């Protein structure tokens, strides 16, 4: 049996970026053969990535990048809040955001196939899964390319906003982006609110109004009033500005001789159903599995 030295472990780690203990195990199994140990690790890390792929990723980060007339925000997901703070994961997210801006992929599939660090985005992601031990995924991105101005705002790493706007004052773009992160509008104007959201709100309003016992014509007016109120609350231009609630966003923009053409808002894990673990059941399952080995 060949002696496994610290320098051999360090060399293998430098080549594969795998955890130190995994490197030592691979070298031991390969009887000190560096090439064989590297091959064993590649297989093992690949298996880790495959096993992790079925696990729910509802935590994660938002990253942004703007260059010239193009900008993007991207959402990458992981399984735990702990890993969302991992430097390698955050660094990867920033590289992905930059690629979206510079390469303009059509979708996440095309993005995953782009070249990165001598490999592909998906291969780098898969290697990171093996290193960290959690499922990691690129969920979505938004990219704007325009002759207008762009502003991005990140609230920590969990909320990201990209805004396309006009106007001489760059602070306007920053203020609008921050407002969107805080107030989370669903559309630019009331005319742009998705029909399914309006239908849902109308249904709720109808149920509430019907319980009032008032005449049908009064109920109809109550429903219309509730829907109109909702439209104002969720459309950006109609919302009171967070830094001065005596003005709406539309009024603030008009005073600054500015306008907003488009925006994208991402909130980490939004719409993803998180896994609810039964800890006692999980431990029992692990004990049972251990007994069968």
Swiss-Prot record:
It comes from the Bacteria. The keyword Cytoplasm applies. Pfam families: EF_TS. Keywords: Cytoplasm, Elongation factor, Protein biosynthesis. InterPro entries: EF-Ts_dimer_sf, Transl_elong_EFTs/EF1B, Transl_elong_EFTs/EF1B_dimer, Transl_elong_Ts_CS, UBA-like_sf. CDD domains: UBA_EF-Ts (cd14275). Transmembrane segments: none annotated. Associates with the EF-Tu.GDP complex and induces the exchange of GDP to GTP. It remains bound to the aminoacyl-tRNA.EF-Tu.GTP complex up to the GTP hydrolysis stage on the ribosome. Belongs to the EF-Ts family. This is Elongation factor Ts. It comes from Paraburkholderia phymatum (strain DSM 17167 / CIP 108236 / LMG 21445 / STM815). The lineage of its organism: Bacteria, Pseudomonadati, Pseudomonadota, Betaproteobacteria, Burkholderiales. The gene is tsf.
């Amino acid at each position: 049996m060949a002696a496994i030295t610290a320098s051999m472990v360090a060399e293998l780690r430098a080549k594969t970026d795998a955890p130190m203990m995994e490197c030592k195990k691979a070298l031991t199994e390969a009887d000190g053969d560096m090439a064989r140990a590297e091959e064993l690790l590649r297989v093992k890390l690949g298996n880790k990535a495959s096993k992790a792929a079925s696990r729910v990723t509802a935590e994660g980060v938002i990253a942004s990048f703007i260059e010239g007339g193009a900008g993007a925000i991207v959402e990458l997901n992981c399984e735990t809040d702990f890993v969302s703070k991992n430097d390698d994961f955050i660094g990867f997210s920033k590289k992905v955001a930059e690629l979206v801006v510079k390469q303009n992929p059509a979708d996440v599939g095309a993005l995953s196939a782009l070249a990165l660090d001598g490999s592909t985005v998906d291969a780098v992601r898969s290697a990171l899964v093996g290193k960290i031990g959690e499922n990691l995924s690129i969920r979505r991105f938004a990219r704007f390319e325009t002759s207008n101005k762009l502003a991005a705002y990140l609230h920590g790493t969990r909320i990201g906003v990209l805004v396309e706007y006009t106007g001489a004052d760059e602070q306007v773009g920053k203020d609008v982006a921050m407002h969107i992160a805080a107030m989370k509008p669903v559309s630019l104007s009331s005319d742009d609110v998705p029909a399914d959201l309006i239908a849902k709100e109308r249904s709720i309003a109808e149920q509430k109004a019907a319980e009032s016992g008032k005449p049908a014509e009064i109920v109809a007016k109550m429903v219309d009033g509730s829907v109109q109120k909702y439209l104002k609350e969720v459309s950006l231009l109609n919302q009171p500005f967070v830094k001065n609630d005596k003005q709406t966003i539309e009024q603030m923009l008009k005073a600054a001789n500015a306008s907003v053409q488009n925006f994208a808002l991402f909130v980490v894990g939004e719409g993803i159903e998180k896994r609810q673990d039964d800890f006692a059941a999980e431990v029992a399952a692990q004990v049972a599995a251990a007994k069968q080995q």
